[in-house]
């Protein structure tokens, strides 16, 4: 037991921060950076796509649904591979692996965000849209100022689940050797070789704590909102 704890203690800085002192974040730090970056791209992107699908319908909605179904029907690991090889061809240069994975996560997650937010918009009474128009609001203003705030409040639990999934999906970055938590845990295991159980139990516990922390923060927010309401 002491030896198992010692291998974690000896490699804790590397598991948490990677080579941050050398300007190369890794481990838990890189996992969080990729998750936050993908969230900052996927959330507004998904909301904007939901707004387009709700506002215009018809061909626009069908094309957006087709895009979302294609993305959601493909394993994320293939999306990462595609961008890994496609982006250098489009940009004419190599992108950092963490950037490529972050973009893949954002692209993949935006499809789920779009569906969730659109469901929230469609659940609102149609009379609200008509009433806002009679008050002089333009359609875009009605969507932005009246409907979206309500829809986002209603789908917050769904969005939290989506972003917890995103946080766990950062572990797929190991496939292109991005040094996030799963990758550095594998590196430590390959170097030490005799304590894999301790290393990967620790890794799983870190993911569990990160996801539980996000869930608890969201629950407290929901509780405060319900109390205030």
Model-found features: residue ranges?
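Transmembrane alpha-helices and adjacent helix-loop boundaries
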Residues: 1-229
């Amino acid at each position: 037991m002491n030896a198992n704890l010692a291998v974690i203690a000896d490699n804790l800085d590397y598991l948490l921060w990677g080579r941050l002192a050398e300007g190369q974040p890794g481990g838990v730090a890189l996992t969080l950076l990729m998750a936050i970056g993908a969230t900052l791209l996927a959330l507004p992107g998904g909301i904007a796509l939901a707004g387009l699908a709700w506002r215009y319908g018809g061909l626009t909605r069908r094309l957006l649904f087709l895009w979302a179904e294609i993305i959601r029907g493909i394993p994320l690991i293939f999306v990462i591979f595609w961008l890994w090889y496609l982006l250098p061809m489009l940009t004419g240069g190599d992108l950092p692996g963490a950037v490529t994975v972050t973009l893949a996560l954002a692209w993949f997650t935006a499809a789920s965000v779009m569906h969730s937010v659109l469901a929230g918009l469609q659940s609102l009474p149609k009379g609200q849209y008509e009433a806002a128009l009679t008050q002089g609001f333009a359609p875009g203003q009605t969507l932005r100022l009246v409907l979206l705030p309500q829809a986002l409040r209603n789908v917050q639990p769904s969005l939290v689940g989506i972003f917890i999934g995103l946080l766990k999906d950062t572990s797929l970055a190991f496939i292109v050797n991005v040094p996030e938590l799963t990758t550095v845990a594998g590196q430590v295991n390959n170097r030490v070789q005799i304590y894999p159980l301790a290393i990967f139990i620790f890794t799983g516990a870190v993911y569990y704590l990160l996801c539980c922390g996000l869930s608890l923060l969201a629950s407290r927010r929901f509780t405060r909102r319900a109390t205030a309401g």
